[in-house]
Amino acid sequence: MEVKSERLFGIPFSICEIDPTLYNKNEIVDDIKSNYLKNPVRNVGNIGRSGDNVHHSYSDWDNLKYNKVKFNKLFQIYKDIIPQCINNFILNKPYNLFFCITNYCCMAEGGHISKHNHGSEDFVGIHYIQFDPKYHIQTEYVNEHPFINYQQELRPDTLSIVGDKNIYNSIYSNVWKFPIKEDEFHIAPGFLSHQVPIQPPCDKLRMTVVVNIKLKCQ
């Protein structure tokens, strides 16, 4: 007897690695670090949340106090890579793609970002341009299915049986963290809520570039 296993209402997710030699990575990292040192808690703009501990650039790009980060070469890399990632999602129609570098985030020990989503976008990309997997804690994707709040109380054995190590069973976990390497680029739907836990001590700053992505039918 043949038995098939599928996943219902699967959330698409794409991961690729961006070659750091193809763009001015060191210059970008240096500029972000310089901006961070001027103000480690640059938490302003429409997504400025008083409880967050992060240096970010959202809605503050024109602030003359900070270095203007030169993303031109990296933008061209994204222009090539993003369609390759999106096409893996098995789409139904030709589309036009629009994206923008909407933010960069930088944090040290104690840094964190509270739960949020990019609900007005089709997808969001997170590029880990500086990340130490030995110390930095990964982005957590939050399971917002309503049953998760009581599933583990009503059926406490389920999670231990299915396990919390296999992504195919992630529906039973409150949050999911992918293993992350520096230079990886992760794309997920904009509606998928995520958060950055409080970071431990590390000599290296945790840096990400955030890309908002929209698709429109041709």
Question: What kind of region is each of these model predictions?
Answer:
Residues M1-F89, H112:
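Non-heme Fe(II)/2-oxoglutarate
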Residues G10-P12, F98, E121-F123, L205-M207:
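Residues at beta-strand starts and edge strands
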Residues P20-L22, I129-F131, N143, I213-C217:
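Non-catalytic surface loops within mature trypsin-like serine protease
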Residues V69-F98, E109-F123, I129-P133:
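Active-site region of the double-stranded beta-helix
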Residues N103-F185, P197:
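Catalytic core of non-heme Fe(II) oxygenases with the double-stranded beta-helix
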Residues V124-H127, D203-Q218:
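A short hydrophobic beta-strand segment most commonly corresponding to one strand
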Residues I187-L192:
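Short, proline-centered helix/strand-breaking motifs
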Residues H194, Q199, L205-M207:
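Extracellular and organelle-lumenal recognition/adhesion modules and their flexible linkers in secreted
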